[in-house]
């Protein structure tokens, strides 16, 4: 199975993965990277995630499926020079950027791990959703779901809820801090670290699980950003 959104699959088909080394930051349980390495006939996949249980599961799956993938339990900021200029392709998917307050620092690490000329494909929630309230927010109005309640530029919040990656079921978690980012923050973080933007696609359908009730109503809900390291 290919565990990507339809539009992401279409973009990845334009990227030559055969014999290449693919890296994924905030890979969760590894299913996306495993499926891409297998379907794209890549030579190797490397995934990073801070959650040790998810990484253990991913490594077990890689062994079970006999795929050339390794997964490391590490804070992205602590990724060492073993991975300097190792990746031909980098993928970043939904739910990664919100864990990082400083995207310039995040993309500095990402760029360090990319070979010159390497490709990056980022599939994330659209930054315009930063302004919307979701069910559970005090501001949420089921009659006016597209009403903007928050600043596009500043929105940091803490929570105790999460969503299972495989089942989309909600659960109670330890308190965490979540950071939202404007499109300019994301693009600048890449450009400041030698990544040239080569494509941007925007979509009016949700990939986060929080805004599907306003799918296809003209509001930007998700995006794919592509780049190359100089």
At which residue positions do the language-model features occur?
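SAM-dependent methyltransferase
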Residues: 117, 122-188
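Conserved alpha-helix/loop element of class I SAM-dependent methyltransferases that forms part
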Residues: 1-20, 35
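A short His-aromatic
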Residues: 98-99
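C-terminal lobe and adjacent flexible extensions of AdoMet/dcAdoMet transferase-like proteins
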Residues: 185-230
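Class I SAM-dependent methyltransferase SAM/SAH-binding core
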Residues: 21-79
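Residues lining the SAM
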Residues: 92-94, 123
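A short glycine-rich, Lys/Arg-flanked "PGG" loop and its adjoining helix->strand segment in the class I
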Residues: 104-119
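A short acidic, Gly/Pro-enriched loop at the edge of an enzyme's catalytic core
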Residues: 81-90
């Amino acid at each position: 199975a290919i565990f990507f959104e339809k539009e992401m699959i279409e973009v990845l088909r334009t990227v030559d993965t055969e014999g290449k080394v693919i890296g994924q930051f905030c890979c969760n349980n590894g299913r996306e990277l495993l499926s891409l390495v297998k379907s794209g006939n890549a030579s190797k996949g490397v995934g990073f995630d801070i959650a040790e249980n998810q990484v253990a599961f991913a490594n077990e799956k890689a062994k079970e499926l006999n795929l050339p993938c390794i997964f490391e339990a590490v804070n992205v900021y602590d990724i060492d020079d073993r991975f300097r200029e190792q990746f031909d392709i980098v993928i970043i998917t939904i739910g990664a950027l919100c864990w990082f307050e400083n995207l310039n620092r995040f993309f500095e690490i990402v760029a360090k791990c990319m070979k010159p000329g390497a490709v990056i494909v980022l599939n994330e929630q659209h930054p315009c959703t930063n302004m919307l309230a979701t069910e559970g927010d005090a501001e949420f109005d089921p009659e006016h779901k597209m009403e903007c309640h928050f600043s596009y530029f500043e929105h940091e919040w803490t929570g105790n809820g999460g969503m299972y990656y495989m089942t989309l079921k909600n659960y109670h978690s330890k308190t965490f801090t979540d950071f939202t980012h404007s499109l300019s923050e994301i693009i600048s973080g890449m450009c400041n670290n030698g990544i040239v933007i080569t494509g941007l696609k925007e979509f009016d359908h949700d990939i986060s699980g929080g805004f599907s009730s306003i799918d296809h109503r003209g509001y930007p809900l998700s995006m794919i950003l592509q780049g190359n390291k100089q």
